[in-house]
Amino acid sequence: MNTRPQFRPVLWILALALVLTACQTETAGDEEAAEADAPTETASVESETIAWDYTGETGPANWAELNETYEACAGSRQSPIDLVADDEAQDVNVEFDYTEAEGTLFDTGHGVQVNIEGGTLRIDGKAFALKQFHFHTPSEHTVDGTSYPAEVHLVHASDDGELAVLGIFYEEGEANDFLAPVWEDLESRATMAAADPLMMNAADMLPADRTTYTYPGSLTTPPCSEIVRWHVMQEPLTMSAEQMEALTAIYDDNNRPVQPLNDREIDRVTL
C-alpha cells in the first residue's frame, strides 16, 4: 500500500517564505536584519514578529492561539508524529541529485541551520530544490515511541510551493565526518555568526539504507502549514559525544511534541 496524499496548492510567494525557514523560524531583530540579503533566510512577517517558543505560554500547546496565522498548528495533519509502519517496505521513485555547494551556518534564534542550495530531490519526477538543513535536539519524530538524541531536517521546495522534508535521526557513536567542519564554528552563537561558508554535498549526509517512513504532514513550527511531504529515514547516523554536546550547548529541547496521526497512513518505502 502506498497511498499518495494530495496537497493543497499554495502561492509560491507564501511557500518561499515557509520553505526558507521550514521547521525553523527566525527571530526578529538584529540577527534578522543582518541576514536580510540572504534568500534562504527570508521569513513571513507574521513568523518574524510574533514570539513563539518551546516552553511556557508561547510553547507548542498554545501556538495556534498566538495569532490567526498560526491556526494551522491545531490542524489534523500536523507534524511530527510517532512513526509506526507494519507493512513491508515498498519501492517509490525518488532520486537524489545533490551537488557540491556553499553552505552557510546560520542561527535562526530557535536552532542551528545551514543554508545551502545544492541540488534537488525528485519524487515521482517532481523536482524539489534543497534550501537548507537544520537540527532538533532531541528528535521531533519518534519510532514506536522511542526518540533519538537529535534529528536533522533537509528542506526542499518545488516550483509550485510544495515542500518535501527529509528527516534523519542521530544517535551517539562515532564522530560524523560530514559535520566535523561545521562543528568547528559551533562554539557559541557568536562564532556561528562569524563562520565562513563551507563547501559541502548533502549526498554525504545520507545513510546507506534508504528505507524511509513517509506521510503527509506539516511544518513543525509556526505557522505549521500542512503542505509537507515527509520522508524520515529509518537508519540513524551517528555523532560523537563531543559533537552532540556542542550541538545541545547551543540549542537543546527545541523539539515539538508528537502530534495525533488522525486518519493519515504511514508508508515505509525504499528510496
Regions of interest found by a model, annotated:
Residues 4-7, 12, 23-271:
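Alpha-carbonic anhydrase
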Residues 1:
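Anion-recognition interface
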